[in-house]
Curated annotation (Swiss-Prot):
<dbReference type="InterPro" id="IPR029052">
    <property type="entry name" value="Metallo-depent_PP-like"/>
</dbReference>
<dbReference type="InterPro" id="IPR004843">
    <property type="entry name" value="Calcineurin-like_PHP_ApaH"/>
</dbReference>
<comment type="function">
    <text>Possesses two activities: a DNA synthesis (polymerase) and an exonucleolytic activity that degrades single-stranded DNA in the 3' to 5' direction. Has a template-primer preference which is characteristic of a replicative DNA polymerase.</text>
</comment>
<dbReference type="Pfam" id="PF00149">
    <property type="entry name" value="Metallophos"/>
</dbReference>
<dbReference type="GO" id="GO:0003887">
    <property type="term" value="F:DNA-directed DNA polymerase activity"/>
</dbReference>
<dbReference type="InterPro" id="IPR011149">
    <property type="entry name" value="Pol2_small_arc"/>
</dbReference>
<dbReference type="GO" id="GO:0042575">
    <property type="term" value="C:DNA polymerase complex"/>
</dbReference>
<keyword id="KW-0511">Multifunctional enzyme</keyword>
<feature type="region of interest" description="Disordered">
    <location>
        <begin position="78"/>
        <end position="122"/>
    </location>
</feature>
<dbReference type="GO" id="GO:0003677">
    <property type="term" value="F:DNA binding"/>
</dbReference>
<feature type="compositionally biased region" description="Basic and acidic residues">
    <location>
        <begin position="79"/>
        <end position="93"/>
    </location>
</feature>
<dbReference type="InterPro" id="IPR024826">
    <property type="entry name" value="DNA_pol_delta/II_ssu"/>
</dbReference>
<dbReference type="GO" id="GO:0008310">
    <property type="term" value="F:single-stranded DNA 3'-5' DNA exonuclease activity"/>
</dbReference>
<keyword id="KW-0378">Hydrolase</keyword>
<keyword id="KW-0239">DNA-directed DNA polymerase</keyword>
<protein>
    <recommendedName>
        <fullName>DNA polymerase II small subunit</fullName>
        <ecNumber>2.7.7.7</ecNumber>
        <ecNumber>3.1.11.1</ecNumber>
    </recommendedName>
</protein>
<comment type="similarity">
    <text>Belongs to the DNA polymerase delta/II small subunit family.</text>
</comment>
Amino acid sequence: MDELVKALERAGYLLTPSAYYLLVDHFKEGKFSLVELVKFAKSKGVFIIDGDLAYEFLQFLGLGVPQEIKESYISTGEEAEKTVESQETRASELEEGGVSQVSSGELQELKEESPEISTTEEEIGGLELVQSSISTGSEVEYNNGENGESVVVLDKYGYPILYAPEEIGEEKEYSKYEDVVIEWNPSVTPVQIEKNYEVKFDVRQVKLRPPKVKNGSGKEGEIIVEAYASLFKSRLSKLKRILRENPEISNVVDIGKLNYVSGDEEVTIIGLVNSKRETNRGLIFEVEDKTGIVKVFLPKDSEDYREAFKVLPDAVVAFKGFYSKKGIFFANKFYLPDVPLYRKQKPPLEEKVYAILISDIHVGSREFCEKAFLKFLEWLNGHVESKEEEEIVSRVKYLIIAGDVVDGIGIYPGQYSDLVIPDIFDQYEALANLLANVPEHITMFIGPGNHDAARPAIPQPEFYKEYAKPIYKLKNAIIISNPAVIRLHGRDFLIAHGRGIEDVVSFVPGLTHHKPGLPMVELLKMRHLAPTFGGKVPIAPDPEDLLVIEEVPDLVQMGHVHVYDAVVYRGVQLVNSATWQAQTEFQKMVNIVPTPAKVPVVDVESARVVKVLDFSGWC
């Protein structure tokens, strides 16, 4: 990765391709420093350094730009005005301490319901703001190399990649695993256990109606804004109901009615977190509901401070405290939707039954652990090495696959060179040929991920059938959405690919991809699979928020980050089911260490991981 791009990324700035080509030679020659460039961008109130800003910066330093480069990389006229307007808007949002989002001011409908309860920083008792350690993430520029131009994109871990048009080499020869045939070991007898499963929730079960616009000629942008308005209203309504089930939460008041509350009356407000800032005396939140917006101060000595510090933008939370007529809500308690401390126990099962959890197979990748996966298929067919494993495999009835089943096409710059199967149709055919070796008495549940042929934004209803047709034809396969809830013998398994982990890692200091169980716990506490709008995870403009965890599951399975982990939080088993892809060259460069070919075995009765199979020796 180029030194200039990487250094700016660490400083929280993005460099467009046009700016890169204007600046890189001067930077390498030592004609300016990174500090000078960052200070200049900061003075302009922008976080994206484009060609126009780069040219202005070079003029400021008295450095020339060749005419042919100037014509190629600097915009003029209307285009430049749009760029400045866009960046000024974004800078204004960042100064407010928030993340660019529809819910915090762009939705006119929400504004018109009640006037905002606003305040100024000076009114918060002279609290001195300090530089926040809470990252707001980075924007992603997706131009996909149109007209042969390079673009800056971020990979799944948030690192920028300089895109260059790929040169497609000679046609590749590859296997689609048509000759792979693995038969059941006749010396092992599968236990006859009646299957008991139900797809309790699937995105396709929900009939979503498009939002209404004021007139029949409504523009596409207006429709999308209305859809996001409906989405945030849906989220607030669902999570508010969950919060009100907490016996500690009482005397709930709408934000728009706080002016009618006496200063000595303790009340509770519930709303979306628009922004969060750290001060030398505590945290300042901007919280919004359908009736208004208010500033909330939580002191540093509060027992809930650490939990509040970890909350993500756009999460729904509750504060208990007192409202000042100066326009500040002084909180003494903070609540997340969270998981109840006590839940009703499920009745025991008559027979032991097991489920296998895997994800991120990445068929088609050069780093796909083919030998390890074949060994896994042999294991599923009873080719085991101990009596203990024989007892387990004879009782395995379910295989759950949580997305990224193939490596995909055009997912990231330069991917073609990383593929052994460069055809998306053939990738799914190869996958189907492999999964055809899963014994028929094992039911497979297969959902999509961001590498799959499916809607890029979450939730993902299913695979695109025209590409993934071969896996739809598997007799013992059930295609599910991302997310989905599967009920196995009365136990609820929440299955999601896990992209929301990215935002948690970006916003919460101390959490990493290397231990994904902890970010998964934070998502469960917030009862949402991807709370932050405008972060690293694209969220579809559906009129209902289907990413809310409305009912507490017995087990949560995710993947995406390629690292195995398993933790239990308040009786809920959380599992990240790792990957079947070995470490790629890019992962080596950024010190991402996957744990491939590790397979958790779950006892369905207890919904707990009881064994982890390790096939990494063949990877």
